[in-house]
């Protein structure tokens, strides 16, 4: 795309427009500046609320993929790519899953997380190469993230995923964007022009992060990674998480701290097994068998053994 054509295309994007409420932001005090930004941020949850049915559709597809051994792949450039990497990296400690289950790919590779890699996002083939490098298949789900909705890196990847027969999801902050037209499921929270014109790390980035939170959290809940609203698959990999594991067991069972700690030690800090053993009186091997029988759904295992 020529420079003139790109300027024209960007001028029509909501996310690139000038915000009439912040035209004098350079004249304001620090308090007034942050008040202006805060006022703009309040629009984000409302924009996401309008997209909840689409988000739920994506959650169902992601959960189904997980249950069939598939993966969730985030793809984006710049801020969008970094947000995908961030959300993916939080899944192993939070839900006790492999770091291969949710993967964040960013245009330009890992180096681009810390420093922008010029030109990487403009390639229609680089996204395809990145998907091929992880053996992407029709069993996986790809979520293309781009505030503008027109990033070539994402467009190429979505087209490739469609050709394979995989589920494709687009997350953008502009209506009727190119990636929304390509993907099977389009999530488009339109948050309006940024407080600082074109700085889509602001409202657009916030909206993207909130949606990604929903996609992984809700899909993990759908495959049994919670009991009530407790993170029962959390991995106790440091002192804080060991303490959290004990607290979760106590909250779920109302047992004494000593029992929670001793049971956790007996299960090698497996929170699910510890809760099941305390609530049902099952020994370790029987608890494992019952949990496996219920495909890891702790609530079902508890209800069937009381």
UniProtKB/Swiss-Prot annotation:
Its EC number is 4.2.1.126. It comes from the Bacteria. Pathway: Amino-sugar metabolism; 1,6-anhydro-N-acetylmuramate degradation; Amino-sugar metabolism; N-acetylmuramate degradation; Cell wall biogenesis; peptidoglycan recycling. The active site is at 90 (proton donor), 121. Keywords: Carbohydrate metabolism, Lyase. One of its GO terms (molecular function) is carbohydrate derivative binding. SUPFAM superfamilies: SIS domain. Transmembrane segments: none annotated. CDD domains: SIS_Etherase. The keyword Chloroplast does not apply. GO terms for biological process: 1,6-anhydro-N-acetyl-beta-muramic acid catabolic process; amino sugar catabolic process; N-acetylmuramic acid catabolic process; peptidoglycan turnover. It catalyses: N-acetyl-D-muramate 6-phosphate + H2O = N-acetyl-D-glucosamine 6-phosphate + (R)-lactate. A lyase-type mechanism (elimination/hydration) is suggested for the cleavage of the lactyl ether bond of MurNAc 6-phosphate, with the formation of an alpha,beta-unsaturated aldehyde intermediate with (E)-stereochemistry, followed by the syn addition of water to give product. HAMAP family: MurQ. Homodimer. Belongs to the GCKR-like family. MurNAc-6-P etherase subfamily. Specifically catalyzes the cleavage of the D-lactyl ether substituent of MurNAc 6-phosphate, producing GlcNAc 6-phosphate and D-lactate. Together with AnmK, is also required for the utilization of anhydro-N-acetylmuramic acid (anhMurNAc) either imported from the medium or derived from its own cell wall murein, and thus plays a role in cell wall recycling. This is N-acetylmuramic acid 6-phosphate etherase.
């Amino acid at each position: 795309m020529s420079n003139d054509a790109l300027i024209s295309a960007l001028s029509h994007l909501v996310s690139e427009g000038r915000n009439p409420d912040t035209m004098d932001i350079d004249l304001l005090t620090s308090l007034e500046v942050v008040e202006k930004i805060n006022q703009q941020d309040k629009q984000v949850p409302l924009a996401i609320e309008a997209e909840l049915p689409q988000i739920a559709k994506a959650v169902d597809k992601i959960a189904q993929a997980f249950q069939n051994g598939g993966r969730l792949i985030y793809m984006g450039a710049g801020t969008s790519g970094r947000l995908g990497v961030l959300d993916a990296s939080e899944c192993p400690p939070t839900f006790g899953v492999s770091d291969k289950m949710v993967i964040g790919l960013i245009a330009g590779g890992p180096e681009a997380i810390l420093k922008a890699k010029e030109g990487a996002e403009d390639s229609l083939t680089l996204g395809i190469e990145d998907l091929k490098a992880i053996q992407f298949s029709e069993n996986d789900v790809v979520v293309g993230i781009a505030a503008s909705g027109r990033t070539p890196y994402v467009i190429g990847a979505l087209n490739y995923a469609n050709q394979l027969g995989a589920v494709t999801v687009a997350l953008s902050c502009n209506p009727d964007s190119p990636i929304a037209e390509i993907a099977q499921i389009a999530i488009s929270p339109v948050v309006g022009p940024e407080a600082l014109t074109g700085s889509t790390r602001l409202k657009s980035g916030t909206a993207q992060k909130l949606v990604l939170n929903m996609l992984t959290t809700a899909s993990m809940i759908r495959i049994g990674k919670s009991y009530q609203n407790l993170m029962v698959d959390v991995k106790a990999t440091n002192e804080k998480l060991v303490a959290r594991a004990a607290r979760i067991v106590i909250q779920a069972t109302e047992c004494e701290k000593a029992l929670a700690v001793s049971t956790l030690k007996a299960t090698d800090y497996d929170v699910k097994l510890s809760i099941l053993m305390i609530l049902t009186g099952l020994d370790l091997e029987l608890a494992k068998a019952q949990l496996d029988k219920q495909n890891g759904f702790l609530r079902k295992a508890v209800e069937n053994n009381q």
